[in-house]
Amino acid sequence: MIREIFNSIMGEGKYIGRRFIFVRFAGCPLNCVYCDEESKGYFNRVEKIPGSGEFETLQKMEIEDIINAIDKLKTPDLFAVSFTGGEPLLYHKQIKEIAEILKDKGYRTFLESNGMFPERIFYFDIASIDIKLKEHFEYIKDEDYEKLYKNELKTIKKLYNLNSDIYAKVVIMEETNIEDVKIIAKDLSDIGNITLCIQPVTPHGNIKSPSQRKLFEIMEACGEYLKDNVMLTIQMHKYLGML
């Protein structure tokens, strides 16, 4: 279930630059072309000292062990505890129990999800939903993509109605169609006052990031519906060599 728990800087999205404890869960039903998480072969790693990047492997990782690990990694500047992945909502029952304990202890809770499981959503203080585009997959049927996209919007709407601080993120590639992102912006504006983070893909192999001009054009197109609720973020942690 748990791949690793560590303390680092949020490297992307609306809260980029804030200090977080990340609880990373293994497994995801999607297979995005730019993702390397599922290639990692380790489990139950816990950082020894906050920000050190040095880990120990635990024999077991029950809920009590997870809470203890979070408490040990807490720093005075901590902003929130992030449930990330993979896709954390594969383990929604366990996460709900962990989140309730953390709330009682005064932590903020943060969800990072692809939004494919709207029926598993419950309240988080903050949530980031990663909206997928067709080019994020080597191949996906039109009907499967439409189902995924509708579920992402349902998830966002549910979190918005729960009064979570919800924002959306979309990874932009060289081949991304501006009109596709503009549709996302319109659909978000129909839900409510939601920030959209435009994130150029981190290039590797055959995957290329978009031009500066395309990024400006996408932001302007989204601004027609979202006004100034559009922002550009990069994977800062990768540029800084952080976890």
From Swiss-Prot:
Gene3D superfamilies: Aldolase class I. It catalyses: 6-carboxy-5,6,7,8-tetrahydropterin + H(+) = 7-carboxy-7-deazaguanine + NH4(+). [4Fe-4S] cluster binds at residues 28, 32, 35. InterPro entries: 7-CO-7-deazaguanine_synth-like, Aldolase_TIM, rSAM. Catalyzes the complex heterocyclic radical-mediated conversion of 6-carboxy-5,6,7,8-tetrahydropterin (CPH4) to 7-carboxy-7-deazaguanine (CDG), a step common to the biosynthetic pathways of all 7-deazapurine-containing compounds. PANTHER family: 7-CARBOXY-7-DEAZAGUANINE SYNTHASE. This is 7-carboxy-7-deazaguanine synthase. The lineage of its organism: Archaea, Methanobacteriati, Methanobacteriota, Methanomada group, Methanococci.
